[in-house]
Curated annotation (Swiss-Prot):
InterPro entries: Flag_Lring
Signal peptide: 1-21
Record-annotated membrane-spanning stretches: none
Pfam families: FlgH
Example GO molecular function: cytoskeletal motor activity
Lipidation (S-diacylglycerol cysteine): C22
Topological category with respect to the lipid bilayer: Lipid-anchor
Record protein name field: Flagellar L-ring protein
Gene name of this polypeptide: flgH
Localization in the cell: Cell outer membrane; Bacterial flagellum basal body
Alphabetic keyword roster: Bacterial flagellum, Cell outer membrane, Lipoprotein, Membrane, Palmitate, Signal
Length: 232
């Protein structure tokens, strides 16, 4: 009875490991949450006959005469000019060597060792050496260019704008998604309502897709199974 229970436990454990190896690994999106924001409606003014009204209607289309039209409220749009060009390289090397040599001799050889050293003076010499050479290197580069219009979804207490946006492009039977989020200083916004991505704080840029091309880049369940079980 105990033998059958042991076999059952072993088979169950192997089945659990097999299912773990076949499990699909979900990808966590870099830009989370909604990718758009709607303007916040203002309070409704009450006609009480007074010149000063505590609740004034918000005119989102209002533009001062001597001021550029720049985003300042939730729901305003802003164009991000993607200019990401990052490269990094690293190399390392290590060398180590050690040599040793020892000489010693016997003027008199014991009788039971004469068959090994002979009857004459015995000289013994030992030497050894150890050498290690190691090298390593890594190179990485990333280039991303384009434009993406985002929406202000939060106005921070210091006046900075938190923006978020998404662009979807359908090509044949696949869809490409470009998502962006970050914090923009209004002073860096140009007169054409654009700001380079290099001047955006806490920037999150995500470029993903779905369809046959994206599925071809993913590892199959059988390959993941053998990869998890392989000791190499």
């Amino acid at each position: 009875m105990q033998k059958n229970a042991a076999h059952t436990y072993a088979i169950s454990s192997l089945l659990v490991l097999s299912l773990t190896g076949c499990a699909w690994i979900p990808s966590t999106p870099l830009v989370q949450g909604a990718t758009s924001a709607q303007p916040v409606p203002g309070p409704t003014p009450v006609a009480n006959g007074s010149i000063f009204q505590s609740a004034q209607p918000i005119n989102y289309g209002y533009q001062p005469l001597f001021e550029d039209r720049r985003p300042r409220n939730i729901g305003d749009t802003l164009t991000i000019v993607l200019q990401e060009n990052v490269s990094a390289s690293k190399s390392s090397s290590a060398n180590a060597s050690r040599d040793g040599k020892t000489n010693f001799g016997f003027d008199t050889v014991p009788r039971y060792l004469q068959g090994v050293f002979g009857n004459a003076r015995a000289d013994v010499e030992a030497s050894g050496g150890n050498t290690f050479n190691g090298k390593g290197g890594a190179n990485a580069s990333n280039t991303f260019s384009g434009t993406l219009t985002v929406t202000v979804d939060q106005v921070l207490v210091n006046g900075n704008l938190h923006v978020v946006g998404e662009k979807q492009i359908a090509i044949n039977q696949g869809t490409e998604f470009i998502r962006f989020s970050g914090v923009v200083n209004p002073r860096t916004i140009s007169g054409s309502n654009t700001v380079p991505s290099t001047q955006v704080a806490d920037a999150r840029i995500e470029y993903v897709g779905n369809g046959y091309i994206n599925e071809a880049q993913n590892m199959g369940w059988l390959q993941r199974f053998f990869l998890n079980l392989s000791p190499m």
